[in-house]
Amino acid sequence: MNRLKEKYQKEIVPSLTEKFNYSSVMAVPKLEKIVVNMGVGDAVQNAKALDKAVEELTEITGQKPIITKAKKSIAGFKLREGMPIGAKVTLRGERMYEFLDKLISVSLPRVRDFRGISKKAFDGRGNYTLGVKEQLIFPEIDYDKVDKVRGMDVVIVTTASTDEEARELLSQMGMPFQK
């Protein structure tokens, strides 16, 4: 069983129940899924750019991403509806916990001059969004094989009803929020 999941069940659930006075164990907020999205704007002119992004996302998450397509045509971006413009992965269960564990303990500390992540990126419904500027912070990515620095969005979806509960859940899991 995953380290983070074990910690959640043994330590986090009791402490959250105590803090927010939940009536049952099922009311305690938990992680639902983590969505990792990589928008590849270059894919419009160069279809090969997307293949590389898909490959990198697969290495980072251990799961094959789906290719996202443009919903609308935008002439300013030379974009037609249905063109592939990105890739995303939805992680649940074991893989989700593994990814979060790796993100907290390995990847985030590797960010240049890292001082913690913003406390303000909650959406009001207990979900947290985090932007990663470069894919190099993940240990699976080999620096020499990278053709271009790409960023990505990581959305952590929890069952918490308020931001405060979600913040408490994530910080007990070890998310390095700014003091």
From Swiss-Prot:
InterPro entries: Ribosomal_uL5, Ribosomal_uL5_bac-type, Ribosomal_uL5_C, Ribosomal_uL5_CS, Ribosomal_uL5_dom_sf, Ribosomal_uL5_N
Protein name: Large ribosomal subunit protein uL5
HAMAP family assigned: Ribosomal_uL5_B
Domain of life: Bacteria
Example of a GO biological process term: translation
Recorded family membership: Belongs to the universal ribosomal protein uL5 family.
Organism: Halalkalibacterium halodurans (strain ATCC BAA-125 / DSM 18197 / FERM 7344 / JCM 9153 / C-125)
UniProt keyword annotations, A-Z: Ribonucleoprotein, Ribosomal protein, RNA-binding, rRNA-binding, tRNA-binding
Pfam families tied to this protein: Ribosomal_L5 (PF00281), Ribosomal_L5_C (PF00673)
Biological role stated in the UniProt entry: This is one of the proteins that bind and probably mediate the attachment of the 5S RNA into the large ribosomal subunit, where it forms part of the central protuberance. In the 70S ribosome it contacts protein S13 of the 30S subunit (bridge B1b), connecting the 2 subunits; this bridge is implicated in subunit movement. Contacts the P site tRNA; the 5S rRNA and some of its associated proteins might help stabilize positioning of ribosome-bound tRNAs.
Gene3D superfamilies with a match to the protein in the record: 3.30.1440.10
Subunit record text: Part of the 50S ribosomal subunit; part of the 5S rRNA/L5/L18/L25 subcomplex. Contacts the 5S rRNA and the P site tRNA. Forms a bridge to the 30S subunit in the 70S ribosome.
One GO MF term: rRNA binding
SUPFAM superfamilies cross-referenced by the UniProt entry: RL5-like
Assigned GO CC terms: ribonucleoprotein complex; ribosome
